[in-house]
A protein has these predicted regions:
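Class I (Rossmann-like) S-adenosyl-L-methionine-dependent methyltransferase catalytic domain
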Residues: 30, 34-103, 141-213
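A conserved beta-strand element that flanks and buttresses the S-adenosyl-L-methionine
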Residues: 112-115
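A short glycine-rich, Lys/Arg-flanked "PGG" loop and its adjoining helix->strand segment in the class I
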Residues: 126-141
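Hydrophobic, gly/ala-rich membrane-insertion helices/peptides used by toxins and envelope proteins
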Residues: 1-35
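Glycine-biased, low-complexity coil/linker segments
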Residues: 1-2, 215-217, 221-223, 229-230
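A short His-aromatic
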Residues: 118-122
Length: 233
């Protein structure tokens, strides 16, 4: 699927640098013991046939504000929805950002990341989600999708995680169920974010809203936001 990125090669040093400048100290303690993936291998997962999926995702985003495609792959989906781009290993085109640390904190009202997380091993995947949370503006919306059990249809060897595989071409794939993706993301981001399932965008997809208002020490939902499960048209 499109939007798949090779950001798995950020590596431990790069991830620590991102964390030191970008996220709270408590989050910096999350382990990042992951193997680096050569970009020429991870780039094999990039696809150019997912423009319709981007159109569906756009229906769930805020109508106003800037959009960032996080892990833009070939950049075709971002072009369709007029989004800025983050892609560390772009080939034959120039993204707006090739290092996530260069993206300002709380700078985008909307973020898409379609079928990116499923090609990342857990340490890098955790950091990608934390970066999306950091970059998202208060009341901003992020749409994330991943593959599901279909990843196991590829030839390869079983990975360390549930529903994961190392393919015969050397790429990593981790499938999610919708409920698993919600729980994993919510636990990682914490109570400052609302994470809900959405349907119509791949095997598993979620909508993240960054909560902005606090009253009496309790985080409250914006009454003007619709937090119910939504379906892409």
């Amino acid at each position: 699927m499109g939007g798949i990125s090779s950001i798995a090669r950020l590596g431990v040093k790069g991830l620590k640098s991102i964390l030191q400048d970008s996220v709270p100290e408590a989050i910096q303690k999350i382990p990042t013991k992951v193997k680096e993936v050569a970009p020429e291998v991870a780039q094999k997962t990039q696809r150019s046939n997912t423009v319709p999926t981007y159109k569906k995702a756009k229906e769930l985003l805020n109508k106003k504000g800037k959009t960032l495609d996080f892990g833009a792959g070939k950049g075709l989906g971002a072009k369709e929805i007029k989004a800025d781009t983050f892609e560390p290993y772009a080939k034959d085109w120039k993204p707006d950002y090739n290092k996530s640390v260069d993206i300002p904190t709380e700078s985008y009202e909307n973020i898409t990341s379609l079928n990116v997380l499923n090609v990342l091993q857990k340490g890098d995947r955790d950091q990608a989600i934390l970066e999306i949370g950091r970059i998202l503006k208060p009341d901003g919306t992020a749409i994330i999708s991943t593959r599901g059990s279909d990843v196991l249809e590829a030839a390869g060897t079983k990975g360390d995680e549930a529903m994961s595989i190392i393919t015969s071409t050397g790429t990593y794939q981790k499938g999610f169920t919708p409920d698993e993706l919600v729980g994993y993301t919510q636990d990682l981001l914490g109570p400052g974010y609302v994470v809900e399932k959405v349907s119509g965008i791949g095997k598993a997809a979620i909508k993240i809203i960054k909560v902005s208002k606090k009253y009496g020490g309790r985080i409250m939902r914006d009454p003007n936001k619709n937090y119910n499960e939504q379906r892409a048209i």
